[in-house]
Amino acid sequence: MDRKEMDTMRKAQLVFLLLWMPLMAHAEHLFEAGLQVGMADYRAQCTYVSPVPSLHAGVQLSYSYHSSRVVGMRAGATIDRHQAGFGKNGYTDTYKTIDIENEPIQIDYTIGRLREMYTTWSVGIPLQLALTGKQVAFYIGPKVVFPLQCTWTENADNAALSVYFPKQDNRVYESFPLAASRSFKEVRNGTHNVQKIQWWLAAELCYDIPVYTAQHSKSYLSVGIYADFSLSRETDPVADRSSLMMLSDTRDGFPLHRELTSVVTALRQEERLVSSRNLFDVGLKLSYRIAPYNPLKKNAKECKCYFW
């Protein structure tokens, strides 16, 4: 390499450093560890049952790069546990109809509360735009989620038999001998598969409280709220599953053998169908952030450029 080429390279380095060093004058690197606790729920079109919210919990490790005091980027990894489902209170269905003295009598089974809950463990990778102020920060951006383990739980509380007299519009639970009533609770568990990759929109608003400030580093305790919404619609993952339980009773010499329909099976019936659903989380977040010392800040402020 001759002298002319070396001079050209040094000039290019000078131009690059003159543009880059002022930009680094306010650059900051943040390392964060956080805990999220809140509510998970489904957004779905359904009239027969109601969504049942439950717990969402997650941990997050992330790295943020702020090229200025206003704009930055954040990337990281999260481990989340979501639980939500659907439920129906006062579930009633007909077992059979019999005639006694030319009067139809309807034998039903009733369930005080019928629920189906889905629990998902997942790993997420968020990539968010950071808008920061003096002590307030707002993050928003996409999040790629990889489900790891998905389970479901069906349970029925306070299930019993009853007899309904249509002409009198009267329902009897205990006194009629043919409806040997029995109250019980039953639970069934299983696993299912969901989409391998899901896209979410993640947002967070937080307030930073300085904890430690020194010449070479800073640390903050961050308190805020978060809201994550799934952009990937989930379809029914257990379309061929059998029913929830078997109800049988032989008291008073009247045998009864009936499969109780699960919530998901009921949802597939005509207008009761929930063809797809979206999961969302909302809650509080507590995190600890560390901003290590950046020696380039001092060099940028003093415009010290070094060449070789």
Functional labels for PLM-detected ranges:
Residues A27-E28, H66-M73, L131-Q135, P210-V223, ...:
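Short loop/turn motifs that connect adjacent beta-strands in outer-membrane beta-barrel proteins
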Residues H26-H66, S287-Y293, Y306-W308:
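Short glycine/proline- and aromatic-enriched beta-strand/turn motifs that initiate or cap beta-hairpins
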Residues I140-V145, C206-P210, F307-W308:
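Exposed, low-structure sequence patches enriched in small/polar residues
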Residues L35-R43, Y65, I79-Q83, T119, ...:
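Transmembrane beta-strands of outer-membrane beta-barrel pores
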Residues H29-L35, V71-A77, W121-I125, V136-F146, ...:
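Transmembrane beta-strands of outer-membrane beta-barrel proteins
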Residues Q60-S64, P126-T132, C206-P210, K285-R289:
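Transmembrane beta-barrel domains of outer membrane proteins
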Residues D41-S54, H82-T120, P147-Q198, R233-D281:
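Extracellular/periplasm-exposed beta-strand and loop segments of Gram-negative cell-envelope proteins
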Residues M1-E28, A291-W308:
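Cleavable N-terminal export/targeting peptides
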